[in-house]
Amino acid sequence: HDALPIYGLCGLIIENQEILKGDKREVFDGMWSSSLTDSTSKGKPDIEAVDLTTRLQDLNNILECTTKPIIFDGDTGGKIEHFVFTVRTLERHGISAIIIEDKVGLKKNSLFGTDVIQTQDTIEGFCNKIKAGKASQITDDFMIIARIESLIAGKPVSDALERAFAYVQAGADGIMIHSKNKSGEDIKEFCLAFRKQYAHVPIVVVPTTYDHIYESELCDWGVNIIIYANHMLRAAYPAMMNVAKTILENERALEVRELCMPIKEILELIPGTK
């Protein structure tokens, strides 16, 4: 799941939230450190404007609250010469994986699609970045997952597959395939074709636009990791806006009482406060 702007609180939610479906316990398996969520919560555009050191401070707050794996949204990964240090730093902090996208130049959010210029790296260039990152690791545990932007850039599934095969050969530990198509059919086509070539390489998807598809169906396509990338921030922001607007309208807080959790509950939310 995505990281909330209140990072430690998000860690607590993901660590502790669970439901029972019949006799089956459902929980979140890990956390996604989203660069969109990270930058938006700081009032910055999603263009890699928030540096690694700042993002690591937030990650440390999450790591105080959770033992679950964290996947770091690495955007483009930056210059190869800088990426090797990013890998070592994340590895040292206990982050489980980084996902980097095969784009170059100023980062623009993928969900803009072809409304903005989306420039893909060459296959050779991105393979070199993957190889350099893998060579810089101290342990074998850290994962570098290659995010393919072909479908975002308006290219066919065949281009995405060509890149995926090359990136795995270069050492990528997994493949993330992204699309803003609402049907999910292009994702399905990619996953089924990729699985014929590689039976065990993890596939990651982010069903923000094709959110009608159940996890079970995605798994049938061969998907291993499903990231709900920004939903908690998108839920929190309208709620906060509504409270602020209602207070302005009524010049008191009574009307927002039913929108807020009781003071007693917030005081007792974090162990050790009382």
Model-assigned labels for residue ranges:
Residues 2-4:
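Short, small-residue-biased leader/transition segments that mark boundaries at the very start
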Residues 7, 73, 94, 133, ...:
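Conserved, mostly hydrophobic/aromatic
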Residues 10-16, 78-91, 209-223:
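Catalytic cores of alpha/beta
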Residues 9, 231-274:
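Extended, intrinsically disordered, low-complexity segments
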Residues 17-30, 95-96, 138, 166-174, ...:
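Glycine-enriched alpha-helix->loop->beta-strand junction motifs that scaffold or abut catalytic
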Residues 46-59, 80-84, 102-138, 179-197, ...:
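Active-site-adjacent beta->alpha loops and helix N-cap segments on the catalytic face
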Residues 30-40, 92-108, 170-179, 224-239:
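Glycine-rich phosphate-binding active-site loops on the catalytic face of alpha/beta enzymes
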Residues 13-72:
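Active-site cofactor/substrate anionic-group-binding motifs, chiefly glycine-
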